[in-house]
């Protein structure tokens, strides 16, 4: 929610995309409801910019949803990409809480829906350094993972917007350590130098892998994830009759 929703603005939409309605609910609510199984046991962090009274919108939606523990961090400037957005959000959350405790980190996009999400049971979540959720697909617009030979749902390489395998990422990323994520980001920024390149999350796993990190992946059916990141996807979602 720290982006500008430019493609939606260019298409004539006046509200930020996460405020847009679909089947009687905002896209924000559709996305966050994906994780309703964890509303009473995990801390949720929402990172946004103050566009169109976003802070008030978030608090109203979160009360309606019943998310037990949450923090909202409002950024005052655009970032270089999703990875920096997460880091700035973690820093803001630490300032709010008065502590910088290390904890597991799950990252997800507010314009994507994963109805009835559950963490995978293919491996022990707390024992791996990270995992990426994938589906079988194609196209150079996705992040990808390359599985290890012999599989075991182990990852040997990740890439952003390069078709290096059929395993396309849904945008759900898990790291066992939030502090390690921040260190990985610092290393990524140093490597990018003054190029001004966008900072993506998926390629950061390669640094963990290079140092012996245990990175896994899960696979879901394409029908189990819904994307609304561009106007055409949103309009396609509007055209689908709700199932309940």
Identify the residue ranges that each predicted region occupies.
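Short aromatic-hydrophobic micro-motifs that form the base-stacking/packing surface
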Residues: 104-108
């Amino acid at each position: 929610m720290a982006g500008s929703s430019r493609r939606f603005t260019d298409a004539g939409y006046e509200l930020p995309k996460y405020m847009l309605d679909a089947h009687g609910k905002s896209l924000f609510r559709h996305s966050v409801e994906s994780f309703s199984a964890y509303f009473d046991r995990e801390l949720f962090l929402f990172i946004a910019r103050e566009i169109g009274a976003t802070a008030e919108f978030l608090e109203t939606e979160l009360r309606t949803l019943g998310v037990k523990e949450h923090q909202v961090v409002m950024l005052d400037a655009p970032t270089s990409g999703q990875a920096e957005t997460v880091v700035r959000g973690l820093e803001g959350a630490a300032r709010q809480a008065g502590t910088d405790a290390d904890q597991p980190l799950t990252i997800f996009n507010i314009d994507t829906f994963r109805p009835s999400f559950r963490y995978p049971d293919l491996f022990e979540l707390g024992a791996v350094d990270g995992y990426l959720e994938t589906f079988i697909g194609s196209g150079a617009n996705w992040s990808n993972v390359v599985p290890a030979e012999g599989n075991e749902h182990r990852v040997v390489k990740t890439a952003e917007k390069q078709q290096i395998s059929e395993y396309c990422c849904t945008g759900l990323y898990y790291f066992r350590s939030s502090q390690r994520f921040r260190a990985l980001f610092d290393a990524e920024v140093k490597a990018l130098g003054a190029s001004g390149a966008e900072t993506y999350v998926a390629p950061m796993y390669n640094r963990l892998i290079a140092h012996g990190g245990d990175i896994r992946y899960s696979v879901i059916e394409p029908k189990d994830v819904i994307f609304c990141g561009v106007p055409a996807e949103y309009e396609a979602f509007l055209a689908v009759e709700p199932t309940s």
